[in-house]
A protein has these predicted regions:
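Flexible, glycine-rich active-site loops centered on histidine and acidic residues
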Residues: 95-101, 123
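A short core secondary-structure module
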Residues: 146-147, 151-195
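Conserved hydrophobic/aromatic beta-strand scaffold that supports enzyme active sites
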Residues: 122, 136-140, 147, 165-169, ...
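Flexible, small-/acidic-enriched active-site or ligand-binding loops
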Residues: 136, 189-218
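A short, Trp-centered hydrophobic/proline-enriched beta-strand micro-motif
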Residues: 117-125
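Alpha-helical interface subdomain recognition
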Residues: 1-83, 89, 101-106, 113-118, ...
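Short Gly/Pro-enriched turn/cap motifs at secondary-structure boundaries
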Residues: 87, 114, 129-132, 156-159, ...
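Short glycine/proline-enriched turns and hinge-like loops at secondary-structure junctions
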Residues: 64-65, 133-135, 159-163, 177-180, ...
Length: 383
């Protein structure tokens, strides 16, 4: 693997840095306090091409490789994880699933809107009673002539309040476990689908997170993505790449924590000198720096494997596991450097810690990642 970036990748990274500086950084505190990112950011993300990364230009995408995608999601994560999540879900989980599994009609209907920011997508997998055990969904899709009628509910759905389309997973057959799960593309204006915004989150407060309720939601059979019974495969393939995106966002959080800690330590004075002169402060900062580099390299390795068409799912779990835990450590250490000021939301490190904490939970908890890695190493499933 070449650890250097191409001119194109360097340019994309700089484009993302400039975008964060111009469109995100000035608003982060206000969005966090209001629990509401300005939705106009979606269109801006589309205009700059970030919602079309790795998607063929034929369908409105901006092309590029997965390392470029990781560079962008890292920078967005450095700026505001609530905004990064918009891209990771609408592009990473929804648009990329349509590109991989959809037929021509589905690609042409949904991809141009998703890549431009005209549409927002959400990923309807998690349920009130089903998180890690994603193969045991209770949402049902029953065939009725040329349609399916869907009943159930989904919980903690990123982009759920804003979404124009849900990539929805429901049990459509009586086959056991995950074999009975199918995937559907459901427009959110379909009769019977209602949404409730979830407020009071610890972190990602600006993100539009929702609970979805489906009562006799009728969709045509043509809304099914991939063959019947392949929904779990759609979900797992999406999450394998999604974990790479989350890992990249976590690198961004950790990098932001490092930048903040260094800046504060070299300015704040105690005992007649800047606190950077104190050995234990340098220890905190050096620990963050090592975590940043290690997490970034693990993430880049996944992107390299994806771009070369090699198996990557286990490496993606490793990257997500390490990077998410590293982001929590980094933000916590940065807060320690700040002392009491770090506990006030006028300073960035408290939000970094709040945002980092959920990264160890969604798209597979740290414990689930360890089971995935352990299964790959031993050949024994502990699920």
């Amino acid at each position: 693997m070449n650890l250097g970036l191409s001119d194109e990748q360097t340019a994309v990274r700089q484009l993302a840095k400039d975008f964060v500086h111009r469109e995100i950084a000035p608003h982060v505190v206000a969005w966090d306090r209001a629990e509401d990112v300005d939705r106009s950011i979606v269109k801006k993300l589309g205009e700059v091409g970030f919602l079309g990364l790795t998607i063929d230009e034929e369908y409105g995408g901006s092309g590029g490789d997965h390392l470029a995608y990781c560079l962008v999601t890292e920078e967005l994560g450095r700026g505001d994880s609530s905004v990064r999540g918009i891209v990771s879900v609408s592009l990473g989980l929804v648009a990329k699933s349509i590109a991989a599994w959809g037929n021509e009609e589905q690609k042409r209907r949904w991809l141009p809107g998703l890549t431009s920011g005209e549409y927002v997508g959400c990923f309807g997998l998690t349920e009130p009673g089903t998180g890690s055990d994603a193969g045991r969904l209770s949402t049902r899709a029953v065939r009725d002539g040329d349609d399916y009628v869907i009943n159930g509910s989904k919980m903690f759905i990123t982009n759920g309040t804003w979404a124009d389309v849900v990539l929805l997973f429901a049990r459509s057959t009586d086959a056991p476990g995950h074999k009975g799960v199918s995937a559907f593309l459901v427009p959110t204006d379909t009769s019977g689908l209602t949404r409730r915004t979830i407020h009071g989150k610890l972190g990602l407060r600006g993100q539009a997170t929702a609970e979805l309720a489906l009562e006799d939601v009728r969709v045509p059979a043509s809304a099914m993505l991939a063959p019947e019974g392949k929904g779990f495969s759609v979900a797992m393939s999406a999450l394998a790449k999604g974990r790479m995106s989350v890992a990249a966002g976590c690198v961004g959080i950790a990098q932001a924590a490092l930048d903040a800690a260094v800046a504060y330590a070299t300015e704040r004075e105690q005992f007649g000198k800047t606190i950077a002169h104190h050995q234990l402060v340098q220890e905190l900062i050096s620990d963050i720096a090592v975590d940043v580099d290690a997490a970034r390299l693990l993430t880049w390795r996944v992107a390299d494997l994806v771009d070369r068409g090699l198996p990557f799912a286990t490496e993606s779990s490793k990257a997500k596991l390490f990077a998410s835990e590293a982001a929590v450590r980094a933000a916590n250490n940065a807060l320690q450097v700040y002392g009491g000021y770090g506990y006030i939301d006028e300073y960035p490190v408290g939000k970094l810690l709040r945002d980092a904490r959920v990264m160890t939970l969604y798209e597979g908890t740290s414990q689930i990642q360890k089971l995935v890695i352990g299964r790959a190493l031993t050949g024994v499933s502990a699920f």
